[in-house]
């Protein structure tokens, strides 16, 4: 029986952030590549079309494991426990953190998804 894309995706979803980081590094070493997004070159200056360097992390759904999501929100925002709980329990979508560099936002997003939340960038 061959491994399908769905099997791989399911396995990746079950991995922790640190395990995913190690996997990316192993793939980079094994295939002698660098995991970075390709950049398309436009004919003229297209500054307005460029991807933003900073984003706001929006919590769209806390999921079924609110306690885990609250812990992550508390950790990444520096809020107290009650303030983090109010943020998660409040009206969604809500900005968890604003003006975050893409690299940091990806790490925070992975933590929130691992805790069971749904997240998007704005």
Swiss-Prot record:
InterPro entries: Ribosomal_bL12, Ribosomal_bL12_C, Ribosomal_bL12_C/ClpS-like, Ribosomal_bL12_oligo, Ribosomal_bL12_oligo_N_sf. Homodimer. Part of the ribosomal stalk of the 50S ribosomal subunit. Forms a multimeric L10(L12)X complex, where L10 forms an elongated spine to which 2 to 4 L12 dimers bind in a sequential fashion. Binds GTP-bound translation factors. Forms part of the ribosomal stalk which helps the ribosome interact with GTP-bound translation factors. Is thus essential for accurate translation. It comes from Mesoplasma florum (strain ATCC 33453 / NBRC 100688 / NCTC 11704 / L1). GO terms for biological process: translation. PANTHER family: 39S RIBOSOMAL PROTEIN L12 (PTHR45987), LARGE RIBOSOMAL SUBUNIT PROTEIN BL12M (PTHR45987:SF4). One of its GO terms (molecular function) is mRNA binding. Belongs to the bacterial ribosomal protein bL12 family. This is Large ribosomal subunit protein bL12.
């Amino acid at each position: 029986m061959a491994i399908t894309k769905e099997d791989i995706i399911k396995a990746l979803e079950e991995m922790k952030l640190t395990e995913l980081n190690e996997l990316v590094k192993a793939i980079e070493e094994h295939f002698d590549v660098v995991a970075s997004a390709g950049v398309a070159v436009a004919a003229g200056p297209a500054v307005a079309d460029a991807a933003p360097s900073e984003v706001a992390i929006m919590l769209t759904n806390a999921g079924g494991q609110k306690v885990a999501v609250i812990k992550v929100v508390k950790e990444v925002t520096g809020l107290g426990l009650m303030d983090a709980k109010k943020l998660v329990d409040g009206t969604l979508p809500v900005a968890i953190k604003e003006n975050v560099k893409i690299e940091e936002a990806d790490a925070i997003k992975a933590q929130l998804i691992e805790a069971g939340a749904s997240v998007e960038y704005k």
